[in-house]
């Protein structure tokens, strides 16, 4: 790339910020006062010897369908940031985290991302559970060249057709879980399946992956029932299931919806008939539901009682930092956010700069040991799709708990090499480095 092209790329983010600032001010979105953006704030730092803080925007739900998971992933990111700040920050700069509620709504996610980048000058964005929200945030992030860590949303499209050079996906996706969970369930559950699907991008693409595994192994999907988000009364769907009498029900339902579904299935004693397979079960969605409601087989990426080095210390650190929490022990959502944030900050340190392209190149292809991540297999970031390939666990309710919170029984684990989403590799077309705006925070 020529010097002229480099200059153009490095200034493109500043130009976008300026244009965005003028547009927002003109529209009156921040009131009648002129919009000064981050420059007014940074002017004060320029007058002192102290380095300005490194701002990280936490784009996590505090309301809506995934509020509980949003709260847990926020704690995970905050813990990783605290550990770095306790050691002096990163590159001699204290890390400042700002949070805005993305409300489990794509439009809100987009507005939050725009505001954090253009007004708060966030160097990085972290967080998402709802895949539609993650996609919306990532489009804004790519426009500015801002690195965005999708910590917990798991539609296969996130590292597939909706991938971006600046986006890194840290959770297992629907295809990974389907390959690990459904294939095994086919051996004991029978041929006729019904799919119960949350009617949005994650649900659709997760059930698509589940259907592919079922049919590839000689099974048949006799019906797919689409469930609108924020459904609380599942009686019509459960009546339909009673009429169909499938061998197995595969659910791609999440957040508060899966809590309501589980409770109503138990009330009708329908968990005692067909086999229930939940593609992925996030810890905040079942914590505190009670023994009967945690039926079936499901996937996860981490559990607080894995017999691995570092796990007990990790749990103790959570309880010390966040005493009195309703969720007394960390789960997969917290673990994903912590690991993502920690690796990002490690990459900044290794790069010796916050320059986005340099940090992106440190993240791409990054390998992380099983010991370091407290899992059974090494993990890595696929340089083609930017998804973290990690251990996938199959679990069920633990009928012999060692303590009150010990509600999962880990049945098996899958090596990430065995459950990779091969379709994502073909669907993902990352933007070039040259087409990605360059900046140094």
Report each predicted region and the residues it spans:
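Sec-dependent signal peptide hydrophobic core
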Residues: 20-28
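Extracytosolic ligand-binding ectodomains
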Residues: 2-6, 11-21, 33-441
């Amino acid at each position: 790339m020529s010097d002229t092209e480099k200059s153009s790329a490095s200034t493109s983010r500043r130009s976008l910020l300026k244009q965005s600032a003028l547009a927002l001010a003109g529209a009156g979105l921040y009131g009648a006062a002129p919009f000064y953006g981050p420059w007014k704030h940074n002017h004060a730092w320029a007058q002192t010897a102290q380095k300005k803080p490194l701002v990280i925007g936490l784009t996590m739900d505090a309301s809506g369908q995934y509020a509980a998971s949003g709260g847990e992933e926020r704690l995970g990111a905050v813990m990783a940031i605290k550990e770095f700040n306790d050691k002096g920050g990163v590159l001699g700069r204290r890390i400042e985290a700002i949070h805005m509620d993305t409300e489990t709504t794509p439009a809100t996610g987009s507005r939050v991302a725009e505001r954090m980048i253009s007004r708060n000058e966030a160097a990085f964005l972290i967080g998402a559970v709802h895949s539609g929200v993650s996609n919306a945030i990532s489009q804004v992030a790519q426009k500015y060249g801002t690195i965005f860590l999708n910590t917990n949303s798991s539609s296969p499209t996130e590292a597939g057709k909706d991938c971006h050079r600046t986006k890194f996906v840290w959770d297992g996706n629907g295809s990974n879980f389907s390959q690990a969970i459904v294939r095994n369930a086919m051996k004991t559950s029978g041929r006729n399946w019904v799919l119960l699907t949350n009617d949005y991008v994650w649900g659709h693409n997760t059930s698509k992956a589940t259907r592919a595994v079922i049919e590839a192994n000689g099974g048949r999907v006799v019906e797919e029932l689409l469930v609108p988000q924020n459904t609380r009364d599942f009686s019509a769907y459960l009546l339909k299931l009673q009429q169909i009498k499938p061998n197995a029900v595969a659910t791609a339902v999440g957040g508060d919806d899966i809590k309501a579904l589980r409770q109503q299935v138990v009330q009708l004693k329908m968990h005692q008939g067909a086999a229930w397979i939940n593609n992925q079960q996030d810890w905040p969605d079942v914590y505190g539901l009670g023994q009967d409601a945690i039926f079936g087989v499901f996937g996860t990426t981490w559990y607080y009682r894995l017999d691995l080095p570092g796990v007990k210390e990790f749990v103790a650190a959570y309880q010390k930092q966040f005493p009195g929490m309703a969720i007394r022990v960390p789960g997969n959502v917290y673990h994903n956010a912590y690991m993502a944030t920690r690796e990002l900050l490690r990459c900044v340190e290794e790069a010796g700069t916050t320059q986005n392209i340099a940090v992106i190149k440190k993240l791409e292809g990054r390998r992380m040991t099983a010991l370091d991540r407290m899992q059974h297999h090494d993990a890595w970031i696929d340089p083609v799709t930017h998804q973290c390939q990690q251990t996938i666990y199959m679990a069920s309710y633990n009928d012999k708990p060692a303590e009150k919170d010990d509600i999962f029984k880990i049945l098996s684990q899958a090596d990430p090499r065995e459950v990779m989403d091969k379709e994502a590799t073909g669907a993902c077309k990352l933007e070039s480095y040259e087409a990605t705006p360059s900046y140094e925070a």
